[in-house]
C-alpha cells in the first residue's frame, strides 16, 4: 500500500472506540442494552410537537446563523442568566454546536496548542484524551480516589481528588483543566468546596477551565450543581458546555452549546466556521421553543428540568437495589444517569475470552453480552493506560430506560444470581 495512504500522525493510535465496539456487540435485538447512554424513554411530547410544526415552515429548512440560530441563543441566554447572575450576550458569549462533542472539539482546537499540558481527571469521557492528542497537547492525568465512610453505602461523593496531588499537576505549561460535573461515569457532583480548590489553582496558574456540564439538570436530592464559571475570577477563563440531548432526552438531535466570555468564544467560532459551519435549523428552532416552555415554568414540578431527575431517581434506586440484591456493591450516583458496580464479586470464569491482554471489565462485558444477553460499558474505557487497573473491576450501567427495559435487565440479573446460588 502506498505510504501516501497512511493516516495522519495526529490520529495515530486513536482508531479504537469503546462505543463502536460495544454498540456493535449490543446490536442484537435479544440483548438488553444498558450500555451506551441514550434514553429509550420518550422525549417530552411538546419537544416532538415543536419539531413537527417547525418542519412545515419553509424558511426554517434552510441555513441559519452559523454560530447559533437567533431564537435559540436568545433562549439559552435567558435560561443561563438566572444562574450566572449577569447578562450573557447571546451573539458573542454563546456558540451552538454539533452536540457537546462539537463544543469540546471547538474548545480544544481553538484554545489548546501543541505542547500545552491539559489536566484530565480520571475517569474521564474517552474523547477528552483523543481530542487533546489530536491537538498535539499532553494530557496530565489525576485520579479520583475512593474514600468510603464506614457503615454508609458507597456513593459517588466518596470519590474525591487529593488537593495536594491535584496541585502538583499544575505548572507553567498547564493551559487548561477538563472538568466534568455531574460526572460520567461515576455520577459525582462536585461540591462548592471541591470546585473552589480547582478554581483557586486555575487562577494561581492562569489556567483555562473547560467545564463539561451536560448532566447539569440530573442532580438527586441532597446534592446541588454549582457552575465553576460563577466563582470569582473564573468567568473570564471558563468554557461551559451543555447538551440538548441530555437536557430533553433527544440525543439524536446532536445539539450542544458553549458559554463563555467573548475573548474565548470567538476562537471557538473560528473553528466552527471552518469545519461544520452551522447546525440544523429546524432542530435549533424546536429546541428554542421547548426551552421557552420550560423557562416560563422553572418552579413548576412539571418543568422537565424538575420532572426528569425525579423520574430518574426512582430508576436509580431500583438499579441500586437490584445490584445489591445479587451481592454487588454499586456506587450510588449523586447525578447523571449511570451507575457503576464492582463485578469482580461475581467471580465469573472468563477463561474462554480470547484476548487476554484486555482489561478484566472488557472481557467481563463481552462475556455478559454473549452469555447473559445484557450489555454494559467497561469503566476502564474512561481511563488512561496507567489507571486502568484501578477501575477495571467496574462496569457502567445506564438507567435512563423504560421500565420494561429495566424489567428485562432485572430478570436476567436475578436468574443469573439463582444459577450461582
Where are these regions (language model features)?
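Glycine-rich loop-to-alpha-helix module at the N-terminal edge of alpha/beta enzyme cores
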Residues: 34, 57-63, 75-78
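Short beta-strand to alpha-helix junction loop
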Residues: 67-68
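PLP-dependent class I/II
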Residues: 1-30, 36-54, 81, 86-421
